[in-house]
Swiss-Prot record:
One of its GO terms (cellular component) is eukaryotic translation initiation factor 4F complex. Belongs to the eukaryotic initiation factor 4E family. Residues 60-63, 70-106, 154-163 are annotated as: EIF4G-binding. It comes from the Eukaryota. Displayed sequence is from cv. Disulfide bonds join C133-C171. Residues 1-37 are annotated as: Disordered. The keyword Signal does not apply. This is Eukaryotic translation initiation factor 4E-1. MRNA binds at residues 78-83, 110, 128-129, 178-183, 223-227. The gene is eIF4E. Its main location: nucleus.
C-alpha cells in the first residue's frame, strides 16, 4: 500500500523525505492563505467536484475510513454543552482522498486560537461520550505555538497507514491550538490496557522523533479533574 511505504521510516527525517514522493502538492506548493476567524477551509476548497477531479489515478484504499472534524472557536462560546460545536468536514477512505483533503484545509499553524482539528476513524465521534471512546484515554505531545504542522502530518500518516502495532486500539487524533502552545493527542479505546497504551506511546514518539517524556491520561480522570488530571502512564 502506498501510504504504508510512505511511513515505514521511523525517523522524522526519513519520513519527511518519503512524504514528498506521495503528496501531490509536494514541497513546492504555495503557502496557505491567512485564516479568517473560525475558518478552516476556503469557500470552494472542499467542493466535491474539486476533490473528484484530483483523483485521477487508481485509488489506493486504506484499511479504515477516516473523518476530519473541526471545532470552530467562534462557535464554542455560543454552545452550552461541550462538543456541541464539533462538526464533520470530510470522510476519506483512500490515500488520494486523504491528500486531496489534507492539501485543502488549513494546517495547525494557520488555525485560529482555540480551534480543534480532529481525524477519527469513521463513525467514531471525537467525544468522551462516544461508546468507543468512553473507556479510553489519550497520549499528548506539546509543541510551541505554530510548530506542530509536521508532527500533525506524521501522526496522521502513522494512523491511516496502520503503522502502530496496536492500531486497533486507536480512535483518532486531535490537534488543539492554544495560547503559547499546540497540543496533539492520540485517543485510544481501552485505557486500562496498559501494554497496548505503552506500545502506542513508544511508537508514536519514534514516528515523531520526539525525545521528551509524554503522558497518558484516562478520559474518566479528565472528566473528573479537568486540567488537574494526572498521567497514569509515561513513555
Amino acid at each position: 500500500m502506498v501510504v504504508e511505504d510512505t511511513i515505514k521510516a521511523t525517523s522524522a527525517e526519513d519520513l519527511s523525505n518519503s512524504i514528498a514522493n506521495q503528496n501531490p502538492r509536494g514541497r513546492g506548493g504555495e503557502e496557505d492563505e491567512e485564516l479568517e476567524e473560525g475558518e478552516i477551509v476556503g469557500d470552494d476548497d472542499l467542493d466535491s467536484s474539486n476533490l473528484s477531479a484530483a483523483l485521477v489515478h487508481q485509488p489506493n484504499p486504506l484499511e479504515h475510513s477516516w473523518t476530519f472534524w473541526f471545532d470552530n472557536p467562534s462557535a464554542k462560546s455560543k454552545q452550552a454543552t461541550w462538543g456541541a460545536s464539533i462538526r464533520p468536514i470530510y470522510t476519506f477512505s483512500t490515500v488520494e482522498e486523504f491528500w486531496s483533503v489534507y492539501n485543502n484545509i488549513h494546517h495547525p499553524s494557520k488555525l485560529a486560537m482555540r480551534a480543534d482539528l480532529y481525524c477519527f476513524k469513521h463513525k467514531i465521534e471525537p467525544k468522551w461520550e462516544d461508546p468507543v471512546c468512553a473507556n479510553g484515554g489519550k497520549w499528548t505531545v506539546n509543541f510551541p505555538r505554530g510548530k506542530s504542522d509536521n508532527g500533525w502530518l506524521y501522526t496522521l500518516l502513522a494512523m491511516i497507514g496502520e503503522q502502530f502495532d496496536c492500531g486497533d486500539e486507536i480512535c483518532g487524533a486531535v490537534v488543539n491550538v492554544r495560547s503559547g502552545q499546540d497540543k496533539i493527542s492520540i485517543w485510544t479505546k481501552n485505557a486500562s490496557n496498559e501494554a497496548a497504551q505503552a506500545s502506542i506511546g513508544k511508537q508514536w514518539k519514534e514516528f515523531l522523533d520526539y525525545n521528551e517524556s509524554i503522558g497518558f491520561i484516562f478520559h474518566d480522570d479528565a472528566k473528573k479533574f479537568d486540567r488537574h488530571a494526572k498521567n497514569k502512564y509515561m513513555a
